[in-house]
Amino acid sequence: MEWVDTGSAMQAPDATFADTREARQAIRAGRWRRHTSGLAPAYVQGNLVILPVDLASDFMRFCQSNPKPCPLLAVGQAGDPALPTLGRDIDIRTDVPAYRVYRDGVLVGEVDDLKALWRDDFVAFVLGCSFSFEHGLIEAGIPLRHVDEGKNVAMYRTNIQTVPAGPFHGPMVVSMRPMKAADAIRAVQITARVPQVHGAPVHIGDPALIGIADITQPDFGDAVRIAPDELPVFWACGVTPQAVVMAAKPALCITHSPGYMLITDMLNRDLPFA
């Protein structure tokens, strides 16, 4: 299987798109193969999980039982790559910059489209993404280190266990953003209002308390500098299904590559507020 280079030597987006269809067209045409943080800042981005239809019901129950890491935005019809509730022209086979392919729980490759892999029994799930609430944090004047450093956000497996459903079980994955204490308080207030994109943090402070042994070594994404006067702030993350897939070992599962999201036509400001 051909691998796509999604290594950590990523730069900050050197372009943004005011029109989401233009952004998806750039991704579809292969002109954008990098992380999507800040790419279309006013619009909702989504994590992706694709499973055979015989596992779809169990995964739906898993998401419903774990709304912090897996807030459902949309579920496709079996065999249909369109997601009209998220965007009229979306084709889930081509509109994500990089996809991961898991077989029996093992990551076997990354591809830049799913045209050769798509099957009539595939069901696509799109989950809310923290890149969506980053727009609100930046507008509130809260600096985000990974954005300033031109990196993907840091993500970690934790010892926080998800609620199992059918074969799906495993640890929660979290994303981390270092902040000064006052900014962390404001970030809690801002993100608590948007549960569809993970809501409030699940932990602030000592990473060891949630099973992270070395915060300088993220499991996904890129490490960032944490200043002495900053606290690590952890949000539930939509990469959780990838850790769950590794534990559940379904015969086949396809996801986005961490940080390489689906850009939707939903405006961040239109997300339901808690």
Swiss-Prot record:
InterPro entries: D-Glu_cyclase, Putative_hydro-lyase, UPF0317
The UniProt record lists the keyword Lyase: yes
Domain of life of the organism encoding this protein: Bacteria
Keyword Metal-binding: no
Top enzyme category: lyase
GO molecular function, one term: lyase activity
EC number: 4.2.1.-
Keywords from the UniProt entry: Lyase
Family: Belongs to the D-glutamate cyclase family.
Protein name: Putative hydro-lyase Veis_4744
Species of origin: Verminephrobacter eiseniae (strain EF01-2)
Taxonomic classification: Bacteria, Pseudomonadati, Pseudomonadota, Betaproteobacteria, Burkholderiales
